[in-house]
Amino acid sequence: CTFVGLVRDMGGPGATGEEIRGMTLEHYPGMTEKALQTIDTEAQARWPLEATLIIHRYGRLEPGDQVVLVAAASGHREAAFEACHFLIDWLKTKAPFWKLEDSSSGGQWVDARDSDDAAAARWMHAGNKSSEAAE
């Protein structure tokens, strides 16, 4: 299973509807890599996976650019699909990235979205040994 996220040309839910000219993604080296490794390790513990991959770009990006790739390989398709969902859901809420969107009205730092928090929260009660042990 793979997922490639692209830079959108319009802001997400709650945005002004302005066209996005680009965005700058910032991260904290060391801290971000550690968070991504922790997310990867958690996925490996939850599902029977052969391999996982997380690649996240940073710096200046334009609409349509690829910004993130998550991948999971497993002998069981459901495990791979669930792991991909988990990887992107947790990455969006637990990895320290900061997004500055550039629109016609200037730059605006993007706040975390409630929908991203809700997507990540479902994995806290996923009914598998790893999530139950974390509770």
Task: Name these PLM-found stretches.
Residues 1-67, 73-75, 81-85, 89-135:
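N-terminal, polar/charged subdomain of small-to-medium soluble alpha/beta proteins
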